[in-house]
Amino acid sequence: MNEITHRTKTRPVKVGNLTIGGNNELIIQSMTTTKTHDVEATVAEIKRLEEAGCQIVRVAVPDERAANAIADIKKQINIPLVADIHFDYRLALKAIEGGIDKVRINPGNIGRRHKVEAVVNAAKERGIPIRIGVNAGSLERHILEKYGYPTADGMVESALHHIKILEDLDFHDIIVSMKASDVNLAIEAYEKAARAFDYPLHLGITESGTLFAGTVKSAAGLGAILSKGIGNTLRISLSADPVEEVKVARELLKSFGLASNAATLISCPTCGRIEIDLISIANEVEEYISTLKVPIKVAVLGCAVNGPGEAREADIGIAGARGEGLLFRKGKVVRKVPEETMVEELKKEIDVIAAEMAENQEKEKQEQ
């Protein structure tokens, strides 16, 4: 990982079998869209998210039925589970009792001190962290009265207020988010938060929109934040299938060199020289490599003259021409293949290289 694009001196916090912060890799999160009390549907969606590359998943816990479902859900999934709690501290206690890995609350809206203390004590006993979720759209009244409207300073003040509540109870396994739907506000809030405290930061642009618009908005905002070395976990919030959130998050992290085990596709824009159906081929290959957990780079290019040289960093690739294609590795042509079989030949080569990479990774783990 490139240290230039990684926030250092961040307090490490355990979430299930993962460690957030410190010098650990940035983690991708998402949230289910199912009713949490529907265990079968929720587990099915979580498994889809996990297959797509989600590393932590959050579920809404609006009532007792949802809280009671936590234990059954936990038994059937492999990634850490987070409970999203508002107002009722008893739901947090039930979720903790059910084996939840992290609780997302705002201590200030849980109620009197004894209620917050009950949640903190239960979390402390189980070694469960608490995420303080600051949102520009739901800042406390006294902060809005002080600043007049949601500001980055107001959001940081809110975060510090909630942090102090937990610290006064000798609780320090804290993660903080500073979400806003306004991109510039979110960027400023995260920058100021990173200077104000050393707890891990969960990144997000809230209510960013539909698949297309939300992807652009999230990439603009979160990309600016990531470029400053800020962020320890991340969720892309979209009005879409949550699997799409994970796909966008993976691509965003790959763009900054922050996803060590993810396949990357290199493909050229179309032009008048192209003799193959580049767009459909690129989409097919992208889908094929989307679940690979190795850092393979694959190229799909339309020009057999310049293609291999332009994608010399690719582990494997094809460059199309009329009726045939060039299969190349690291910029050097391996062989010519007929157009009708070049995608299948590329997939075979991808499988071989991916298997080699996975084997090497396993050997490195055993040697450590």
Swiss-Prot record:
Could you say which cofactors this protein requires? Answer: [4Fe-4S] cluster
Q: Which pathway does it operate in?
A: Isoprenoid biosynthesis; isopentenyl diphosphate biosynthesis via DXP pathway; isopentenyl diphosphate from 1-deoxy-D-xylulose 5-phosphate: step 5/6
Which is one GO molecular function term here? iron ion binding
Q: What is its EC number?
A: 1.17.7.3
The family database entries (InterPro entries) matched by this protein are listed as:
Dihydropteroate_synth-like_sf (IPR011005), IspG_bac (IPR016425), IspG_bac-typ (IPR004588), NO2/SO3_Rdtase_4Fe4S_sf (IPR045854)
Keyword Iron-sulfur part of the UniProt annotation: yes
Catalyses: (2E)-4-hydroxy-3-methylbut-2-enyl diphosphate + oxidized [flavodoxin] + H2O + 2 H(+) = 2-C-methyl-D-erythritol 2,4-cyclic diphosphate + reduced [flavodoxin]
The cofactor note from the UniProt entry for this protein is:
Binds 1 [4Fe-4S] cluster.
The UniProt entry, under HAMAP family, shows:
IspG (MF_00159)
Q: What is this protein called?
A: 4-hydroxy-3-methylbut-2-en-1-yl diphosphate synthase (flavodoxin)
What species was this sequence derived from? Bacillus cytotoxicus (strain DSM 22905 / CIP 110041 / 391-98 / NVH 391-98)
